[in-house]
Amino acid sequence: MPLKDIRFVIGQKKYKMNANPFTRRDFIKSMAFSGMILPFIPKNIKIQSEMGKRIGIIGLDTSHSVAFTKSLNLDTQNTVFDGFKIVAAYPHGSRDILSSSERIPGYTEDVRKLGVEIVGSIQELLKKVDFVLLETNDGRLHLEQAIEVFKSGKTTFIDKPIAASLADTKAIFREAEKYQVPIFSSSSLRFATGMSAVKEGKIGQILGADTYSPMKFEKTHPDLFWYGIHGVEMLFTVMGTGCISVQRTISEQEELCTGIWKDGRIGTFRGLKSGKQDYGGTAFGKTGILTLGPYNGYDPLLHQIIHFFKTGIKPVQKAETLEIVAFMEAADVSKQKKGAMVKISNL
């Protein structure tokens, strides 16, 4: 498919549309953008993509699904996407988290207007796609849904949180290895402004880091799993693995989770519960100090996902994802123990 065009199939007829003149910057500014562009797209369309570049989404209960679809199906000027398209989606999805389940009808219509075929089951989806984005907002469903995908052998990206517990996270990796399916999971904040400079060694050896993000809660998930994971993902992107203990301090306005690494380094995550809500942090290096952030949208993560689908090379390793989840679970245990230090090895 030429990158300068979007081709749709309606019945047996092919329609060709000129590439949309708006940029991805316009897309990110507002989810309402879909109301500006979608009326120009014929109804009942089906997006067409090359064999080997067809992506399916599981879970239309999150804005990530709509954002990813807009980028891949409309932004034809981005050569990094290399013709990969979202061609089918299974809507469910959380059924008992109201803030998620009530979004499904609207997001389903949004992606349908972007040329995505809506299917009634994961099995039906798997017959139509080459790769899978497991986007279901409810981490409790990920293990069950992931196993169904793994049995098909399809390479999979699992959006945050990878699961709602450390036990389920371990089980997901175990099942992926059993069926020899490449997977990775990540928050988009891993690729925020400044992160690449840290990884490239611009400030030398990392001595410590402080990160922050909003901290919203969902009663069905441990506290940090729902939203705090964004800041925790940033922390581990900078610090790497090796955290041995976590201690959590709680106030009405904010929370502080302090991690001690095996080499003596200290990393902290600050969860913002009031005041200005944002994402960022500071990395402390041997030769410099670097500000992390601001958040720069979903596309940097999507670039990594497409590269992963093309090459099988994981941008985030299993050990780091497991430790991120262990850190968050240890923070929950610390809360239960009234702020006591919790060793990750004891989980």
What are the residue ranges of the model-derived segments?
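N-terminal Rossmann-like dinucleotide-binding module
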Residues: 34-110, 204
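A contiguous active-site-proximal alpha/beta segment in oxidoreductase catalytic domains
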Residues: 162-221
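Rossmann-like dinucleotide-binding domain that binds NAD(P)(H)
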Residues: 210-276, 319-322, 326
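Beta-loop-alpha module in the N-terminal Rossmann-like domain of NAD(P)-dependent dehydrogenases
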Residues: 116-173
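Interdomain hinge/lid region at the active-site interface
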Residues: 275-313
